[in-house]
């Protein structure tokens, strides 16, 4: 991004920020909680950008003064050296801020702010794959809890020996998709299963899909396309067990997507949950098809969301987690404990690097 384009975008962002501040002072906005929250969130997103831009402008003034001082010091070796050091320090900070601001102005995924449906499916490996799916679920639950996100299971198919054949978690919070989108793909584990009597290492897999939540306006469903049936659900015990048909089996006939929801206590709640899951699945399917139409370079990027991509291997023997997209290793135990900050942070940095590279190529063209 050239200097004039960067300046124009920063000035536009600052103008938007000032406008949002004026709106927050409007009594009509204060009386509308939904609108107020949306404006406050956008203001909070822009504030660091505006503050950095203000610092950049101050720096440019200091650079000008430093260059003038350097001219005045010609002939005084000691003063000239001090002035050169000062100018070099200012130039370094200016370069750092310019890069930071350029990254902040890169095109944003409009889905980044959304909550998600996190689907984990056992893959190859039989019972051990189901147990591994359960381990991944705990990893994401711990990570989400550390960030203050709300995590709830909304659909599950438990395995006989522990874990899950399939599990869908609702993860609600600020900018959930912006981080968890990097988890989509095949997660492979290499370890000795608890059921292995010979001590042999087995390789099992689980697939993670990260689906941004979709509302009823964004994904409209035709009732004629839906086939809904009910079944008995275990419930919470006592008289409700296996006596009331609260479970909902939902089939979307055009896509063949089926959703079975049993987590809620009433049939109406399970029906709403099933429709929520279906909308998220249909939106994700539409986005995957759109991505498939793009170039292979785009699909290879970090965070592309390809659920068939083998993204990570968890090796218990060596206490190592390898992210194949990054070509980097991380300590296994902290990762399984939900300490994903370094790993996801590295994915975000790589995505930004790829975007900057693409932007640079566009400028050259």
Curated annotation (Swiss-Prot):
Keywords: Cytoplasm, Methylation, Protein biosynthesis
Residue segments, region Disordered: 289-316
Residue numbers bearing the N5-methylglutamine modification: 239
Superkingdom to which the source organism belongs: Bacteria
GO molecular function, one term: translation release factor activity, codon specific
Location in or out of the cell: Cytoplasm
InterPro entries named in the record: PCRF (IPR005139), Pep_chain_release_fac_I (IPR000352), Pep_chain_release_fac_I_sf (IPR045853), Prokaryotic/Mito_RF (IPR050057), RF-1 (IPR004373)
PTM statement from Swiss-Prot or TrEMBL: Methylated by PrmC. Methylation increases the termination efficiency of RF1.
Major site of localization recorded for this protein: cytoplasm
SUPFAM superfamilies: Release factor
SMART domains attached to this UniProt entry: PCRF
GO cellular component: cytoplasm
Role this protein plays: Peptide chain release factor 1 directs the termination of translation in response to the peptide chain termination codons UAG and UAA.
UniProt family annotation: Belongs to the prokaryotic/mitochondrial release factor family.
Full protein name: Peptide chain release factor 1
Gene name of this polypeptide: prfA
């Amino acid at each position: 991004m050239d200097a004039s384009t960067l300046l124009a975008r920063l000035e536009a962002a600052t103008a938007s920020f000032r406008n949002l501040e004026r709106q927050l002072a409007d009594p009509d906005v204060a009386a509308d909680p939904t609108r107020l929250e949306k404006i406050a969130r956008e203001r909070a997103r822009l504030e660091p950008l505006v503050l950095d831009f203000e610092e950049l402008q101050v720096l440019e003034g200091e650079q000008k003064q430093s260059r003038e001082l350097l001219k005045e010091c010609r002939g005084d070796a000691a003063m000239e050296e001090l002035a050169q050091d000062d100018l070099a320090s200012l130039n370094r900070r200016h370069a750092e801020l310019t890069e930071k601001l350029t990254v902040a102005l890169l095109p944003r995924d409009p889905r980044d702010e959304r909550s998600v449906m996190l689907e984990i499916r056992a893959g190859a490996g039989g019972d051990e794959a189901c147990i591994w799916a359960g381990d991944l679920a705990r990893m994401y639950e711990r990570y989400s809890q550390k960030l203050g996100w709300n995590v709830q299971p909304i659909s599950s198919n438990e395995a006989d020996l522990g874990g899950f054949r399939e599990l869908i978690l609702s993860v609600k919070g600020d900018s959930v998709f912006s981080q968890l989108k990097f988890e989509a793909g095949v997660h492979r584990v290499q370890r000795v299963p608890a059921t292995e009597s010979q001590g042999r290492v087995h390789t099992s897999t689980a697939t993670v899909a990260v689906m941004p939540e979709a509302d009823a306006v964004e994904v409209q469903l035709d009732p004629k396309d839906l086939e809904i049936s009910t079944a008995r659900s275990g419930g919470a015990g006592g008289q409700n067990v296996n006596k009331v048909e609260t479970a909902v089996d939902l089939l979307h006939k055009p896509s063949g997507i089926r959703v079975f929801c049993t987590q809620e206590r009433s049939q109406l709640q399970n029906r709403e949950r099933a429709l929520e899951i279906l909308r998220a699945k249909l939106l994700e399917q539409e986005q995957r098809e759109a991505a498939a139409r793009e170039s292979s370079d785009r699909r290879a990027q970090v965070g592309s969301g390809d659920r068939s991509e083998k993204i990570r291997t968890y090796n218990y023997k060596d206490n190592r987690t390898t992210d194949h997209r990054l070509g980097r290793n991380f300590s296994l135990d902290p990762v399984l404990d939900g300490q994903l900050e370094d790993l996801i942070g590295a994915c975000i940095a790589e995505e930004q690097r790829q975007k900057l590279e693409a932007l640079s190529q566009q400028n050259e063209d």
